[in-house]
Amino acid sequence: NVGSVMRAAGCYGANSVFYTGTRYDHARQFHTDTKEKHLELPLIGVEDLKDIIPVGCVPIAVDLIEGAKPLPDYKHPPRAFYIFGPEDGTLKKEITDFCRETIYVPTNGCMNLAAAVNVILYDRMAKGDNFSNHLKVT
């Protein structure tokens, strides 16, 4: 998943990717970042995401939970810090309480983490008005 998340982050112009926990540390040996986006984009493990949110960014939880706003109706803030839940669970309540908003992708069931990242970042780009970074073909 991390390799696919890094590829999506690179494709859609994210500035960095942060993660918590130890799953990635155990999976790092499998080298799933086939486009080596980690060389262009910081991938940083942190203890608590609340401590690393860049100044001016709005924390947005992405989780399939009661009360979340559907993505098709959502207007992304100019500077967002998206926090995604794990595939085999949900975000802790302290995280969703901390976030300004919680959004979800309307589906029948839950999505793979990397697929959800792609959908959210594509939606952000598609609803935006600056495609200049996305016109180059590589």
Predicted region positions:
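Short secondary-structure transition/capping segments
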Residues: 28-32, 72-74, 115-116
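Structured adenosyl-cofactor binding patch, chiefly the S-adenosyl-L-methionine
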Residues: 10-11, 98-135
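RNA substrate-binding interface of SAM-dependent RNA methyltransferases
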Residues: 2-63, 125-130, 134-137
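A short acidic, often aromatic-flanked loop/helix-cap motif at beta-alpha or helix-coil junctions
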Residues: 48-53, 67-69, 110-112
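Active-site/ligand-binding-proximal alpha/beta "capping" segment
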Residues: 65-103
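Short, acidic/turn-prone active-site loops that include or flank metal/cofactor-
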Residues: 22-24, 86-89, 106-111
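Alpha-helix C-terminal capping segments
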Residues: 49-56, 74, 96, 105
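Conserved RecA-like P-loop NTPase ATPase core
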Residues: 1, 9, 83, 116
